[in-house]
């Protein structure tokens, strides 16, 4: 994928804001007005009316080199031709059509029977100039907690179908790369499945399973990243490692203690997390000299460390997390109890511009408001420079 301009939209989704500034950072006094959280009924996104029409179409990156794409969709029936994807070069006359066969599966879960699930991998793709210059964003990063099906009896799988239709207008046209959250953990009716954790970078996605040492997998995966081809190293987790909100405080600590030294050593640029339903951005800090068990140790600024961004604020049925710790810790640069989304524009191999947008809340605010922004400098190429 071209490096001249890459845009990532991150979500987990007052005209004048007043900020409280401390030695630590900024705590926005803007708090989203608490309103009843109403879940959309299943009928809001019904199945398509056409016979055996594909639905819930979504794409995600399909290889480590950025030249593959996985196309996924669902149909009610498994008929001849339902498992074939036809594709061609953009702006061509269609005479060079190619096709890819998809794997097919279905499943039962309590009293639910799925449609037929298809996954086709297209390989050997080239990046076109009109795609590289697309201002709409080339990928969406989602840090977990998607449909909240697990909040319903028997983890109502119809919610996944409804969610798939809901996001299709975006997910069918730009790759979504997501981490699995706690709301994605489903269990068999009697025996729990193995827990999965997902890590992603710009050019790949790593799935960690309990059958293989996550640390060993992470070490192996980080060694594969060629920073001359993939200058920016971005990681997705679900539970944040640096979180100054009383909600889910220090729930990611055991993971941080295990993995953080490797993130610093390999100069990871950004770590995005969800889980906490608010927004927070850290300084470049590390705590690799400590093994925190009581929360009393203090992280230090470290220009080899990532910026940690909690962006679990994309909207949900559980409400906003508006209980920040006071005083604001020194590692916290900016935090706000609102819903929003972020845009990361990778300008080149050394610089990226990051903005966090507070979602529109009422009719008097015409669009999302940029409440936080920062220029980021690549840790691999500009490792000794300050980031702001």
UniProtKB/Swiss-Prot annotation:
One of its GO terms (cellular component) is extracellular region. Keywords: Glycoprotein, Hydrolase, Iron, Metal-binding, Secreted, Signal, Zinc. Zn(2+) binds at residues 145, 182, 238, 275. It catalyses: a phosphate monoester + H2O = an alcohol + phosphate. Glycans are attached at residues 97, 111, 226, 291, 348. Residues 1-24 form the signal peptide. Fe cation binds at residues 145, 148, 277. GO terms for molecular function: acid phosphatase activity; metal ion binding. Binds 1 Fe cation per subunit. Binds 1 zinc ion per subunit. Homodimer. Belongs to the metallophosphoesterase superfamily. Purple acid phosphatase family. PANTHER family: ACID PHOSPHATASE RELATED, PURPLE ACID PHOSPHATASE 11-RELATED. This is Purple acid phosphatase 19.
């Amino acid at each position: 994928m071209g490096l001249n301009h890459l845009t990532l939209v991150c979500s987990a989704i007052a005209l004048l804001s007043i900020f409280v500034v401390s030695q630590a950072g900024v705590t926005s006094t803007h708090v989203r007005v608490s309103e009843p959280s109403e879940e959309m009924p299943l009928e809001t996104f019904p199945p398509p009316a056409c016979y055996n029409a594909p639905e819930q179409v979504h794409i995600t990156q399909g290889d480590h080199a950025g030249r593959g794409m996985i196309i996924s969709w669902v149909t009610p029936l498994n008929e001849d031709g339902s498992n074939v994807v036809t594709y061609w070069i953009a702006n061509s006359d269609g005479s060079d059509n190619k096709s890819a066969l998809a794997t097919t599966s279905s499943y039962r879960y309590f009293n639910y029977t799925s449609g037929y699930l298809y996954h086709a991998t297209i390989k050997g793709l080239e990046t076109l100039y009109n795609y590289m210059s697309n201002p709409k964003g080339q990928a969406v990063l989602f840090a977990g907690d998607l449909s909240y099906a697990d909040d319903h009896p028997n983890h109502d799988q119809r919610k996944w179908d409804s969610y798939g239709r809901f996001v299709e207008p975006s997910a069918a046209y730009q790759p979504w790369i997501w981490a699995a959250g706690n709301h994605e953990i489903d269990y068999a009716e009697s025996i729990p499945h193995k827990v999965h954790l997902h890590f992603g970078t710009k050019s790949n996605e790593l799935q960690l399973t309990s059958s293989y040492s996550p640390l060993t997998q992470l070490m192996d995966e980080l060694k594969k990243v060629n920073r001359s081809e993939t200058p920016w190293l971005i990681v997705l987790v679900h539970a944040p490692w640096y979180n100054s909100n009383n909600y889910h405080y220090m729930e990611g600590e055991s993971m941080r203690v295990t993995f953080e030294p490797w993130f610093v050593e390999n100069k990871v640029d950004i770590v995005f997390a969800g889980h906490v339903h608010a927004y927070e951005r850290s300084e470049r800090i590390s705590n690799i000299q400590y093994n925190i068990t009581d929360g009393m140790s203090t992280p230090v600024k470290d220009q080899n460390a990532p910026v940690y961004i909690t962006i679990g604020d994309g909207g949900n049925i559980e409400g906003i997390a508006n209980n920040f710790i006071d005083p604001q810790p020194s590692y916290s640069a900016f935090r706000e109890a609102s819903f929003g989304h972020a845009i990361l524009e990778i300008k080149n191999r050394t610089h990226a511009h990051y903005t966090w947008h507070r979602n529109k809340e009422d009719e008097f605010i015409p669009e999302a408001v940029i409440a936080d922004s920062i220029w980021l400098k690549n840790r691999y190429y500009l490792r000794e420079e300050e980031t702001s």
